[in-house]
């Protein structure tokens, strides 16, 4: 099975992706994680990507597609794309590379739909565990001096660099709304629209229910 999941910033793509790969025994391909790994390497490309991300702009398609091309060379044909494709050009690339490598296409496309105000509130308060990638809200912790991941017990919880600037957040959300219209049309026969304003368990249940119906 090949699944792709996309949605605006703060919609819970990473959280739901983690649940989906466990539920359906899939490998995860996260564009965000790939980019963050390059940034943390301190390379020239990493510095350029860091500057782009901090300004709220999107990474060039060529960079994204090259990363995905290399990653797919290491995978079989059961995986989930977290946060990809982000525009129609990337969708065409994905269709082409899947047909070349596996003679197939994406089976299920999940769009997480989220109110803009909710997205902004989530992003302003988001913390991410640097070790296991679990996501938290600052409101989950009573003591700001005792931030510990409940999953892996790491104390390395930090804000993402692209969550620190409100104007950058607004640009990311605005760009998403521009690009998602063409993605909906391109994937209209495979698209599952999910209300991401709900809590994590409710979103998980809605996704699994709609996947079950689509596979009948």
From Swiss-Prot:
Positions annotated to bind AMP: 36, 57-59, 83-86, 90, 160, 172
S-S bridge residues: none
GO molecular function, one term: ATP binding
Alphabetical list of Gene3D superfamilies matching this protein: P-loop containing nucleotide triphosphate hydrolases (3.40.50.300)
Binding site for Zn(2+): 129, 132, 149, 152
Keywords: ATP-binding, Cytoplasm, Kinase, Metal-binding, Nucleotide biosynthesis, Nucleotide-binding, Transferase, Zinc
Keyword Zinc (UniProt): yes
Free-text comment on this protein's domains from its UniProt entry: Consists of three domains, a large central CORE domain and two small peripheral domains, NMPbind and LID, which undergo movements during catalysis. The LID domain closes over the site of phosphoryl transfer upon ATP binding. Assembling and dissambling the active center during each catalytic cycle provides an effective means to prevent ATP hydrolysis. Some bacteria have evolved a zinc-coordinating structure that stabilizes the LID domain.
Family according to the record: Belongs to the adenylate kinase family.
The name this protein goes by in its record: Adenylate kinase
Originating organism: Wolbachia sp. subsp. Brugia malayi (strain TRS)
Name of encoding gene: adk
């Amino acid at each position: 099975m090949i699944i792709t999941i996309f949605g605006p910033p703060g919609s819970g793509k990473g959280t739901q992706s983690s649940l989906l790969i466990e539920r359906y025994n899939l490998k995860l391909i996260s564009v965000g994680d790939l980019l963050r790994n390059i940034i943390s390497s301190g390379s020239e490309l990493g510095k350029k990507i860091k500057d782009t991300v901090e300004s709220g702009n999107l990474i060039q398609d060529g960079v994204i597609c090259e990363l995905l091309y290399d990653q797919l060379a290491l995978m079989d044909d059961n995986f989930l794309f977290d946060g990809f494709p982000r525009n129609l050009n990337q969708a065409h690339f994905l269709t082409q590379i899947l047909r070349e490598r596996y003679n197939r296409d994406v089976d299920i496309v999940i769009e997480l739909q989220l109110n803009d105000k909710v997205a902004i509130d989530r992003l302003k308060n988001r913390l991410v565990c640097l070790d296991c990638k679990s996501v938290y809200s600052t409101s989950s912790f009573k003591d700001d001096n005792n931030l510990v991941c409940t999953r892996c017990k790491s104390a390395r919880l930090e804000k993402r660099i692209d969550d620190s600037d409100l104007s950058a957040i607004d640009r990311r959300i605005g760009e998403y709304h521009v690009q998602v219209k063409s993605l909906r049309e391109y994937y209209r026969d495979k698209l599952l629209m999910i209300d991401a304003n709900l809590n994590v368990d409710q979103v998980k249940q809605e996704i699994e229910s709609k996947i079950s119906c689509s596979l009948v």
